[in-house]
């Protein structure tokens, strides 16, 4: 029996943060699948494992506990798998990074596809994306990050902040060359950290599985098609 059951769509996107933390912690999980997600979402709230509006949703089988919302899931995994930093300040910073990462992917999909990308919208958005990248760069700098060593919040080994950051940027830059070039120019230490952490065996294996399972898909749907159109990918 696997340790967890994860409900997320058949794309990387937001669910990849949860998958990455599970993989990094060497935990096993099954994926509920798109049909099961729709059935839960369209069914009565009283029958949901936990009241939720949309995935990701994670069920801890051993604990018989279900939780939704990406930051809440990652906080739960961090606490129960002993992956959180020792101090309250660094735990708070870890969750800030997780929430920032969630905000970035909301931005990159125009709040889940409420609008579609046009060249003008992308041009107007570029400074904001560069600012997001600079936030990562400055966070790392304040905690001793260098181009060839160190971690986002310091310490001697990768933490959740590093795993989530590497997943955010590598999933995006692997699929969009222009964003890759932007990250290299705007936040070179973050780009280097992303490569180092993404090359960890567990995360490299997960990325390879995502390519096998989802191809080049990022978030899917019309919003991804419009993003690829403005980026020329």
What are these regions (language model features)?
Residues 78, 169, 207:
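Active-site-flanking alpha-helical
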Residues 89, 96-199:
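GST-like fold's C-terminal all-alpha helical module
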Residues 210-233:
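Acidic/histidine-enriched, glycine/proline-rich intrinsically disordered or flexible terminal extensions
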């Amino acid at each position: 029996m696997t340790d967890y059951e994860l409900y997320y769509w058949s794309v990387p996107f937001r669910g990849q943060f949860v998958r990455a933390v599970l993989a990094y912690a060497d935990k096993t999980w099954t994926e509920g699948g798109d049909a099961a997600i729709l059935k839960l979402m369209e069914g009565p709230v009283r029958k949901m494992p936990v009241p939720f509006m949309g995935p990701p949703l994670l069920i801890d089988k051993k604990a018989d506990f279900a939780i939704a919302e990406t930051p809440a899931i990652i906080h739960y995994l961090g606490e129960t798998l002993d992956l959180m930093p020792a101090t309250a300040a660094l735990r708070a910073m870890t969750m800030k990074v997780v929430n920032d990462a969630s905000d970035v992917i909301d931005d990159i999909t125009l709040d889940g596809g409420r609008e579609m990308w046009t060249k003008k919208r992308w041009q107007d958005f570029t400074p904001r994306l560069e600012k997001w990248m600079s936030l990562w760069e400055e966070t790392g700098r304040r905690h001793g990050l260098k181009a060839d060593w160190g971690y986002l919040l310091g310490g001697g080994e990768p933490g959740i902040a590093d795993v989530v950051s590497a997943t955010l940027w590598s999933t995006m830059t692997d699929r969009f060359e222009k964003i890759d070039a932007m990250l290299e120019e705007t936040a070179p230490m973050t780009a280097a950290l992303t490569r180092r952490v993404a090359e960890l065996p567990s995360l490299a294996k997960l990325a390879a599985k995502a390519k096998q399972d989802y191809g080049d898909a990022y978030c899917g749907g019309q919003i991804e098609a419009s993003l690829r159109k403005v980026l020329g990918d």
